[in-house]
Amino acid sequence: MRRIAVMGAAGRMGKTLVEAVQLRSPLSGLTAAIVRPGSSLVGADAGELASLGRLGVPMSDSLEKVVDEFDVLIDFTLPEVMLKNLAFCRKAGKAMVIGTTGLGAREKQLLAEAGKEIPIVFAANFSVGVNLSLKLLDMAARVLGDDADIEIIEAHHRHKIDAPSGTALRMGEVIASALGRDLQQVAVYGREGHTGARERETIGFATVRGGDVVGDHTVLFATEGERLEITHKASSRMTFAKGAVRAALWLDGREAGLYDMQDVLDLR
């Protein structure tokens, strides 16, 4: 059995991850659940908090306290929290599955350095459908080339704090790479006022925030006479959680390295 720890186990995504781990039993089992230091939930049963019944896994407020109880840590927390956990797991030799978004160049460099010592799966989105979409986007960009104007539209719930979403940015990176472009040079984030005619090589991003939208992404390839749209809509966080657990199981026995869901799904 793969012993899995969930960071932020009291949050919305954390509870879903706890449930997803148990759904893969006996291949995986929740053996540690971590909440923020000082939380009133320390000692509470992780299964009961996730409405699964008692699992016998008490909430802890420290990785140090449960270091001998897990093989891989699943972490969807904020960047500053994830980086502390990364440093701990790197020192302790623990594998990680990371779904944190909003990372900058420095944070990604730290991930790359840690990947030289421990196995890590890092992805902006763990949905199987989204990762299949990335493969389709690469194909579409290569076929349509410079003939298409490309726009990426994403929508999420009102509580999401980063924009564009990590998934939208990853989609942009895949498309830009296929076209031999640098996303940082060609990305346009929103438009307002008298913008002038659209420059052919730009990749546009539009963001919508509202309600309880789990995550919608559409990429528009607009050419003269026709449009191609590739859309993915998530209706439940469970799709991300199941993908993360799949990644955790895939890491079993892997050598150190920085992997993503394209590796897990053999889509390279």
UniProtKB/Swiss-Prot annotation:
InterPro entries: DapB_C, DapB_N, DapB_N_CS, DHDPR_bac, NAD(P)-bd_dom_sf. It holds the Pfam family DapB_C. It catalyses: (S)-2,3,4,5-tetrahydrodipicolinate + NAD(+) + H2O = (2S,4S)-4-hydroxy-2,3,4,5-tetrahydrodipicolinate + NADH + H(+); (S)-2,3,4,5-tetrahydrodipicolinate + NADP(+) + H2O = (2S,4S)-4-hydroxy-2,3,4,5-tetrahydrodipicolinate + NADPH + H(+). NADP(+) binds at R36. Gene3D superfamilies: Dihydrodipicolinate Reductase, domain 2, NAD(P)-binding Rossmann-like Domain. NAD(+) binds at G8, A9, A10, G11, R12, M13, G99, T100, T101, A123, A124, N125, F126. GO terms for cellular component: cytosol. The active site is at H156, K160. (S)-2,3,4,5-tetrahydrodipicolinate binds at H157, G166, T167. It comes from the Bacteria. The keyword Ribonucleoprotein does not apply. Its EC number is 1.17.1.8. GO terms for biological process: diaminopimelate biosynthetic process; lysine biosynthetic process via diaminopimelate. Pathway: Amino-acid biosynthesis; L-lysine biosynthesis via DAP pathway; (S)-tetrahydrodipicolinate from L-aspartate: step 4/4. It is found in: Cytoplasm. GO terms for molecular function: 4-hydroxy-tetrahydrodipicolinate reductase; NAD binding; NADP binding; oxidoreductase activity, acting on CH or CH2 groups, NAD or NADP as acceptor. Keywords: Amino-acid biosynthesis, Cytoplasm, Diaminopimelate biosynthesis, Lysine biosynthesis, NAD, NADP, Oxidoreductase. Belongs to the DapB family. Catalyzes the conversion of 4-hydroxy-tetrahydrodipicolinate (HTPA) to tetrahydrodipicolinate. This is 4-hydroxy-tetrahydrodipicolinate reductase. It comes from Pseudomonas fluorescens (strain ATCC BAA-477 / NRRL B-23932 / Pf-5).
